[in-house]
């Protein structure tokens, strides 16, 4: 009988020691285990390569090392990126772009002044036909200058939207995989269709439908000011309203669907996880509680990795859109300022055309901002996914 008791006590302490060893896992151990997962490791390597390739096109992320950033975030709770260097790069970029757009502003103002002088000279000679020829000659040069800068801005906006889409296509599979491995199966199942729509369809809607509508409104502004008598103001306003309605509708539907489905799925995952942990705690003798706590610890570390990747993703997303926003904001401001400066001295049709071009630039800027907003919200939903695991 005594031997049996000794054997039972030995087994009990032996099992407890094993459970303790399994439960205590260091951060480096968890990171190593995640790096050994083939799917996650493959996606991470692809993401690192993609970010390194982006550095040739986006100079603001030259100082970002994705591998070191994630390691620093996991160990210290924050990345190792120097925001002072980023700020210095942004200021340098702004000054460089200001020099460029000031040349554009100077060209516009000179043409407006020249048009005004020619008109005054021809009015003094009482020759309407020559005056009209001089006006249309200056107007044509103005159209060429504004169109060149606007087409460059359209190209920048398209590249920004496609760049955001490509980056999201690279980082979202990793985040979704980690959420699924952390127990958020229902959340992944509901987010997958939304992510597919966001990454593949929404950028095409903007590039192939909304931006061409903005280009049409830009062209119609010049047609509207060709004549002082025949106007198409209502058509210009209608096209602008359509572009705004399309953007507002897409944002509203996307965010509402994402929020509702995310809340519902996270609730289901929370109930499932608590039920599973309760079953492990109560139906597995001796080691059930330790095993349940070990699962929570491992999953908690996986969420830290997810948050590190999400933090880096948000930072890169901001850096991707920063240059296009700075460029388009400055050009739009120059258009508006040029229209204001030339209004007292130039023909009303000239200033109206410049102001209309500025309004079209604002619509172009809204495309980048609305696409960025949707992906920001998607990032926020994914970053908050899995919090029930730690609290559950």
Residue ranges and their predicted role:
Residues 1-112, 116-135, 149-159, 163-164, ...:
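Gly/Ser-rich, low-complexity
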Residues 114, 118, 122, 219, ...:
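Alpha-helical membrane-inserting segments
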Residues 127, 228-232, 343-351:
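Juxtamembrane helix-boundary/capping and inter-helix hinge elements in multi-pass membrane proteins
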Residues 136-149, 168-185, 205-214, 218, ...:
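Mid-bilayer segments of alpha-helical transmembrane spans in multi-pass integral membrane proteins
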Residues 191-312:
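Generic multipass alpha-helical transmembrane bundles of integral membrane proteins
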Residues 307-348, 356:
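Helical hairpin unit composed of two closely spaced alpha helices linked by a short loop
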Residues 327-335, 339-343, 347, 362, ...:
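Membrane-helix cytosolic exit motif
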